[in-house]
Amino acid sequence: MKRFWQIAVLLSFYITVQAVPAPPAESDITRLFEQGFGQELLFFMPEKLPLEIERIQNTMVKKLDQYVKAGVLTRENTRFLAEKIMYGEPREVSVGGYTYKLNEASQWVSPKGIYYGHPRIREILEVSTPMDINGRIYCEVYLSWYADQLPEWLDKIDWRAERALKRARESKEKPFEKRLNFEFKDGKWDIWKDKAPQTLF
């Protein structure tokens, strides 16, 4: 009887192992990454826009003016009320300044911000062994990716001053790294999708 149960346990283990599929092939991972993230455009906002600032805010004016010259922001002269301390008391006074907005006429601009590239897979670093968790089969893929098709406007600004843009410019040599969960469903692997979708950041 003991021998029977040993065989039953081994057989059950063998069936369970056999039921778990092989991990996704690198070609499938690349294809699924391109489908899931390759068309996902990357957007950047130098500040929360539209933004109204005084002319005397030289540092901010200098920062935003380079985006105006690059054609992705617009600048308009304006006057608005600002609180100033006068004679020891706060008062609202009319000041001269600028209003900065996204340049909707630019091909690089959308309501989401300023386009600065889109993801491309760089290297598949590791693929875990598939696991059955509560009747659902998952595996984890550790990969690196970079920002591709960087737009020309980046060459017209000091991109080193903005971390997101700096990382994008350097990402071919220093790629981003990400762990993504994959699920085996309906006989094939796919990027795991839940109520909160996986992101690259």
Q: What is each residue range found by the language model?
A:
Residues 10-18:
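Hydrophobic h-region of N-terminal signal peptides that target proteins for export
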Residues 89-103, 149-173:
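Mixed-charge, low-complexity intrinsically disordered segments
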